[in-house]
């Protein structure tokens, strides 16, 4: 099945503590989750590794968020949008449902 949300897409969070925030998708996981830049930040306690010269401490990093809790952001309308598929010149492409504009 083709993915509606892909890496480097700009998405907007629909639910949760980061509702309304926008970010770029860094990674799409096979478990139905995505990692979005600057969204769902968690604090991870990291142990020092002297052999690698790696300091310990508390590190903030992005945690995965369910793909159903994000929607692709349509810059033309300034809102979240739904994604559809169609064939153009024999290739399957994604498009915004609201204005039928092809997604990069």
Curated annotation (Swiss-Prot):
HAMAP family: Ribosomal_uL24_B
Molecular function via GO: rRNA binding; structural constituent of ribosome
Protein name according to UniProt: Large ribosomal subunit protein uL24
An individual GO BP term: translation
Superkingdom of the source species: Bacteria
Entries under InterPro entries matching the protein: KOW, Rib_uL2_dom2, Ribosomal_uL24, Ribosomal_uL24_CS, Ribosomal_uL24_KOW, Translation_prot_SH3-like_sf
Sorted UniProt keywords: Ribonucleoprotein, Ribosomal protein, RNA-binding, rRNA-binding
Gene3D superfamilies assigned to the protein according to its UniProt record, in alphabetical order: 2.30.30.30
One GO cellular component, as annotated: ribosome
Family classification: Belongs to the universal ribosomal protein uL24 family.
Subunit structure: Part of the 50S ribosomal subunit.
Function: One of two assembly initiator proteins, it binds directly to the 5'-end of the 23S rRNA, where it nucleates assembly of the 50S subunit.
Signal peptide: none
Entries under CDD domains matching the protein: KOW_RPL26
């Amino acid at each position: 099945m083709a993915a509606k949300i892909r890496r480097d897409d700009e998405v907007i969070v629909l639910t949760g503590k980061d509702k309304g925030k926008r970010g770029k998708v860094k990674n799409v996981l096979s478990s139905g989750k995505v990692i979005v830049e600057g969204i769902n930040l968690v604090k991870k306690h990291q142990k020092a590794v002297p052999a690698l010269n790696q300091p310990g401490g508390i590190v903030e990093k992005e945690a995965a968020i369910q793909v159903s809790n994000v929607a692709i952001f349509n810059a033309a309308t300034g809102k979240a949008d739904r994604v559809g598929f169609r064939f153009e010149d024999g290739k399957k492409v994604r498009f915004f449902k609201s204005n039928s504009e092809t997604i990069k």
